[in-house]
Amino acid sequence: MKEKRDLKIQAIENGTVIDHIKAGQALNVLRILGISSAFRATISFVMNAPGAAGIKDVVKIEGKELSVEELNRIALISPKATINIIRDFKVVQKNKVVLPSYVEGVVRCINPNCISNSSEPIKSKFSVLQSEEEGVTLNCLYCEHVISENIAENLL
């Protein structure tokens, strides 16, 4: 007899649940959101959990509703993620992340000669494109360098 296995993460009273994160990307989602050990709210996450659509990660952030801008940056590494806003243990809002057309100060340009990598106080700026064949592609607005792989490795 096949045993049923459920994904068990404690429910949160108020906060944000980020579901359907690309497998193995939960820690990078936390990096994108600027969440570190100094963050004082409760964070729960599961990596490589089985789901109906395959393997996924899930992140729960207690007591904090993230801004639309924060959430949409997640689309850089997990364009199919969904966001659930929780109040009194109930989902009151559910949205898919939206890939922004532009990001600033989120990703490091891979071109070592780019002005954003110099000692000048200039934040990196990228236009963001998505295609079925290539996935997410970032184009540096300063040097026109393209990042289409390993975006997570270049997060600031």
Swiss-Prot record:
Organism: Methanosarcina barkeri (strain Fusaro / DSM 804)
A GO BP annotation: pyrimidine nucleotide biosynthetic process
Binding note for cofactor: Binds 1 zinc ion per subunit.
Binding of Zn(2+), residues: C109, C114, C140, C143
Annotated family: Belongs to the PyrI family.
Cross-referenced InterPro entries: Asp_carbamoyltransf_reg_N, Asp_carbamoylTrfase_reg, Asp_carbamoyltrfase_reg_C, Asp_carbatrfase_reg_C_sf, Asp_carbatrfase_reg_N_sf
Pfam families tied to this protein: PyrI (PF01948), PyrI_C (PF02748)
Gene Ontology MF term list: metal ion binding
Name of the protein described by the UniProt record: Aspartate carbamoyltransferase regulatory chain
Keywords carried by this UniProt record: Metal-binding, Pyrimidine biosynthesis, Zinc
